Amino acid sequence: MAKKVEKLVKLQIPAGKATPAPPVGPALGQAGINIMGFTKEFNARTADQAGMIIPVVISVYEDKSFTFVTKTPPAAVLLKKAAGVEKGSGTPNKTKVATVTRAQVQEIAETKMPDLNAANVESAMRMIEGTARSMGFTVVD
C-alpha cells in the first residue's frame, strides 16, 4: 500500500545553501522532518545551480519520512539574471529598468517549460514576456 501524504511544504531556497536556520528549519520542524537529512540532500542535489533560488515541494508522509521535488527557478529570477539587474521596477508601467531580447526570453521559456502550463514554446514565451513587462523590462527583437 502506498504511504499516505500527511503534509506538503513549499519553500524557495537558494541552491546549495539550505541550512537549519530560519526559514527552512522552522518550516520543516513543524512538519516533523529530519532537518539535517533534508538540508544535506537538497544541497547535494542543487550544488550545480549555485546562485539560483530553487522552489522545492516536500511531501511529508505519516511515518515522518519525506520526498521532495525541485522545480526550475522562478521566471523573475531568470529574467533578472539575463538582464543583469538586481531588482525589477517599482512602477513598471512608468519606469523601465532593463531590456531583454526575444532570444533570452526563448531560452528562459525552454528552461521553464517542464514547470509551465504551456502547450508549446511560443505560449511559454508569451508567459515569460508578460512576467518581464510586469517587472518593468522591455522585450526587444
Swiss-Prot record:
SUPFAM superfamilies the UniProt entry points to: Ribosomal L11/L12e N-terminal domain, Ribosomal protein L11, C-terminal domain
Highest taxon listed in the record's lineage: Bacteria
Alphabetical keyword list: Methylation, Ribonucleoprotein, Ribosomal protein, RNA-binding, rRNA-binding
Molecular function via GO: large ribosomal subunit rRNA binding; structural constituent of ribosome
Residue ranges of the TM segments: none
GO BP annotations, alphabetical order: translation
Pfam families: Ribosomal_L11 (PF00298), Ribosomal_L11_N (PF03946)
InterPro entries in the record: Ribosomal_uL11 (IPR000911), Ribosomal_uL11_bac-typ (IPR006519), Ribosomal_uL11_C (IPR020783), Ribosomal_uL11_C_sf (IPR036769), Ribosomal_uL11_CS (IPR020785), Ribosomal_uL11_N (IPR020784), Ribosomal_uL11_N_sf (IPR036796)
Post-translational events: One or more lysine residues are methylated.
Statement: the UniProt record of this protein carries the keyword Iron-sulfur: no
GO CC annotations on file: cytosolic large ribosomal subunit
Family classification: Belongs to the universal ribosomal protein uL11 family.
Subunit structure: Part of the ribosomal stalk of the 50S ribosomal subunit. Interacts with L10 and the large rRNA to form the base of the stalk. L10 forms an elongated spine to which L12 dimers bind in a sequential fashion forming a multimeric L10(L12)X complex.
NCBIfam families the record matches: L11_bact
Function: Forms part of the ribosomal stalk which helps the ribosome interact with GTP-bound translation factors.
Name of the protein in question: Large ribosomal subunit protein uL11
The organism's taxonomic lineage, starting at the top: Bacteria, Bacillati, Bacillota, Bacilli, Lactobacillales
Gene: rplK
